[in-house]
Amino acid sequence: MPEFDPQNRSPHLLIVSHDVVDKMMAGPGMRYLEMARVLKDEIDVTLAVPAQTSLDITGLNIVVYQEAQPGTLQVLVENSDIVLVSGYMVEKFPFLETTSTRLVVDLYAPFILENLHYYLDEPMNYQQAVNSQAVAITNCLLKIGDFFMCGNSRQRDLWLGALTANGRVNPLTFADDSRLQKLIDVVGIGFPARQPRHEQAMMRDAHPLVPGDARIVLWGGGIWNWLDPLTLVQAWPQVVARHPEARLVFLGTRHPNPDVPYHEMVDKTIALAEQIGEKDKTIIFIEWLAYMERESLLLEADVGVMLHPIHIETRYSARTRVLDYLWARLPVLITEGDVTSEWVARYGLGRVVPEGNSDSVAAALNEILDQPKAAFAQAFEPLMQRFSWPVVVQPLLRYCREGEYAPDRLNRRSPDVTTSISSPLIRSWLARSVYIMRTEGMQALLQRAWRYFQWRVARL
């Protein structure tokens, strides 16, 4: 196993992003880019990305790995002291199960819960197959990690239960730290330790439907199936009746990562906007903006909106776009039920509304728009330091500097995932095969099977 001597050199951390990191990117890409940007000033960091990027950041080494060639990532992993991984990567790159490099597992996005809503319209046997796959992959991650990160304190309780079920809460980890923060800690979403910059006009006097005196209500991210943009559109006629200068802007109808499936909620939202007669009038749909351009749009907006149904995914979610709103001191309209809604209520950052109630949404929006945006500015001050990336990333930095394996890693048996068809991960691969064949075709399934075969042969 690679040994780290803190007296001789800085530990080398490899951050592996499973999502696009470029001028246009979604929450995961932003998360890993900002982590790497902050940590590069403290330790040796490489950011590995799945596609070519045009970004060039001074002092940050960015490399490209290819899913079709697992060796491109494996050589990076085996030559690092610590690697940060997440999600389905352990399935795509099985060598992660046996690497001696220390593993940090990012549990920020609980995809088991996301899938429950995402596949809701599929046949039940298909939903169960997808769920079994997600559970098996999650359990594998929980067994092999040395340190785990999650998005908030609610998530930490959820994941502590899962870690307990996987044998990771044990006398060894308890003796190491009775609070188990050396095993799992909160590394949520932050914002840069600087003020956002308005470098170009994005909507006011720059878009033909947005006059200079417009009050902009911003849906600042993807229109995902598990969110609730429809209630916002239903409420909109009551808003423009009182504030005819208001414009509702939806950002990001299509994910910047082409591998992410299209969400039906986009079509439903556009159709409802047409139905009420406001599409391309006071309701505007724009494409995903470049990462730096979003700052200008955030500063032009008057309200940031995040509406969702209340369900299990909501309770444990951590929405990137809400942190963007907070960074720009943008008053927030949000549905109750998640952690960020508690912040909005506690600090007076906007208004919290019940789920699915268009009258409440309209009343809250009108109340916010009745006041100048500056009326809310001071309420954001207590959060500026707390949620800056240099503060948020501290638990990960502490782990990297300590350079330790989990105390139970060397004393537990490596997970046996190859000897029996009854293995949970084997069963998940069977479910995954069905899923790939249905969504990507037989050729894609055969290509993935061939890559896995090559990896197994290389280990003989």
Where are these regions (language model features)?
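C-terminal amphipathic helix plus adjacent low-complexity
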Residues: 179-180, 384-460
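Conserved donor-binding/catalytic core segment of Leloir-type glycosyltransferases
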Residues: 14-17, 191-195, 202, 206-227, ...
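Acceptor-binding helix/loop patch of EC 2.4 sugar-transfer enzymes
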Residues: 18, 22, 105-136, 157-159, ...
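N-terminal subdomain of nucleotide-sugar transferases
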Residues: 1-54, 238-241, 436-460
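Nucleotide-activated donor-binding/catalytic signature segment of Leloir-type glycosyltransferases, i.e.
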Residues: 252-254, 261-295
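Donor nucleotide-sugar binding/catalytic pocket of nucleotide-sugar-dependent glycosyltransferases
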Residues: 140-204, 212
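Nucleotide-sugar-dependent
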Residues: 227, 290-296, 304-326, 334-342
